[in-house]
């Protein structure tokens, strides 16, 4: 079970709303979000309702302002609790759509796809075990995308506007 608290003002001030499960529409509970406290679980936050828009991965900790979670603004409109995975993690990435071209398998965090695999783009992928967060830039920076087990035949399937991938991280409650 997870617990996350959203605050309208920076520094955990102002009106707050506590959540413990997926919520496709947070708009009725607060108008803006400038700080967050994650007491338990790993969460993916979304800029718009129904799990749309920019995504932000948060694990246990305090985030006193939206820059701390790499937010572009104070808009958080939906959230998803990511189920904890206790087994191994495994993903296959491909340089072309529909699982074509060079394939590389990943089983742990990768801070730079360029350094490890000489890749800057991933056009399709297959998440075999565990949930992952894909980052547009190296060192876990830039736009973020939640990847749950399943097939992603093209980058549009994970919500990206292009195939640029800089780093990948396993979703775990600790690092």
Curated annotation (Swiss-Prot):
Organism: Bos taurus (Bovine)
Family: Belongs to the beta/gamma-crystallin family.
PROSITE patterns hit by this protein: CRYSTALLIN_BETA_GAMMA
GO molecular function: structural constituent of eye lens
Record GO biological process: lens development in camera-type eye; visual perception
Domain notes: Has a two-domain beta-structure, folded into four very similar Greek key motifs.
Keyword Nucleotide-binding: no
Keywords in alphabetical order: Disulfide bond, Eye lens protein, Glycation, Glycoprotein, Repeat
Name of the protein in question: Gamma-crystallin B
Glycosylation sites: 3
Gene symbol of the encoding locus: CRYGB
Domain Beta/gamma crystallin 'Greek key': 2-40, 41-83, 89-129, 130-172
Disulfide bonds: 19-23
Role played: Crystallins are the dominant structural components of the vertebrate eye lens.
Cleavable signal peptide: none
Region (Connecting peptide): 84-88
Family annotation (InterPro entries): Beta/Gamma-Crystallin (IPR050252), Beta/gamma_crystallin (IPR001064), G_crystallin-like (IPR011024)
PANTHER family hit by this protein: BETA/GAMMA CRYSTALLIN (PTHR11818), GAMMA-CRYSTALLIN B (PTHR11818:SF101)
């Amino acid at each position: 079970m997870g617990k996350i608290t959203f605050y309208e003002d920076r520094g955990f001030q102002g009106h707050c709303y506590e959540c413990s499960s997926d919520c496709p529409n947070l708009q009725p509970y607060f108008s803006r979000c400038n700080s967050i406290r994650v007491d338990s679980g790993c969460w993916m936050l979304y800029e718009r309702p129904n799990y749309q828009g920019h995504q932000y991965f948060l694990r246990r900790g305090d985030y006193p302002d939206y820059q701390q979670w790499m937010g572009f603004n104070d808009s958080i409109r939906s959230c998803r609790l990511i189920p904890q995975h206790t087994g191994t993690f495994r993903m296959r990435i491909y340089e072309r759509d529909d699982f074509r071209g060079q394939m590389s398998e990943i089983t742990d965090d990768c801070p730079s796809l360029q350094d490890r695999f000489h890749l800057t783009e991933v056009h399709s992928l297959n998440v075999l075990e565990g949930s992952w967060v894909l980052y547009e830039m190296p060192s876990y920076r830039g736009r973020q995308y939640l990847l749950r087990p399943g097939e992603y035949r093209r980058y549009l399937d994970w919500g990206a506007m292009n195939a640029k991938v800089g780093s990948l991280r396993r979703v775990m409650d600790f690092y």
